[in-house]
Amino acid sequence: MNGLARAKLMDKLMTVVFYCVAGFFILLLVSLALYVIGNGFRNFSFSLISFEGSGLGNLLFNTLYLVFLSLLVSVPLGVAAGIYMAEYAKAGRFTRFLRMCIETMSSLPSIVVGLFGYLVFIVMTGAQWNLFSGALAVSILSIPLIMTVTEDAFKSLPEGYKRGSLAMGATLWQTIYKVLLPACLPRIMTGVILAAGRGFGEAAALLYTAGMSTDISWSSWNLLSPTCPLNPFRPGETLALSIWAARTEALAANSAQLANLASAILMLLVLSFSLGARCLSSYLDTKSGGSK
């Protein structure tokens, strides 16, 4: 067998290998999703997702509300930090030190972030466990991700975007706000999706900060009330925390069933949020003229 035939055979062999690897991961994801969702909705009844008793309705609301609060904090800070690193930061010791700090933050174990949040947001402030402290803890984990995605998005744009805008007399900030940022929105949305997904499934950081209460009064809309649904300074148990509690404490008779259903709901939340955000990202990409 000559060298050319050997190279073609190796090319076909590696193509088959890579297709098999891709198929394995697709099969793994589909199998996991079907198992979790099927196991969760087995013997399903609407009482399990009610907003009373041991139903998961309040936990679902707490999860969505906490993710919303964390994105309110992490998205502006992460995008601003990414813009600074891409457009304003100069090469030097300070920038290298800042990048090292960001890389360290991104690799911190969530349990360490939770303990930090407990000591700073709870103990030092004298507050009780609350959703906002949990959102801040999740934001610490999300900001490096959003910042890195934003920086990469800005640096991947053609240089002509920036030079053309500056040549027309626009300032650097006008160029960033009106030209570069809209062009980067689809990729920034990817970072937001990943950050939200981490917020949905986070448990260790919330164990020390958000609390385990499900006491919500849907007739009370006074933001100062400890049972008001929209009060960010009330304790709030999330779906991920309920899974941990059901598998460790099992206080309710149907704890295992509730844990399985909570896992299925979390899986559907992440999948639906990712698909919806992907559609929005494609729409923004098309609107900005980035689609091919």
Predicted regions and their residues:
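Interhelical loop and adjacent transmembrane-helix boundary motif
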Residues: 48-54, 206-266
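Transmembrane alpha-helices
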Residues: 71, 149, 172-212
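Transmembrane-helix boundary motif in ABC transporter permease subunits
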Residues: 70-102, 115, 123, 277-286
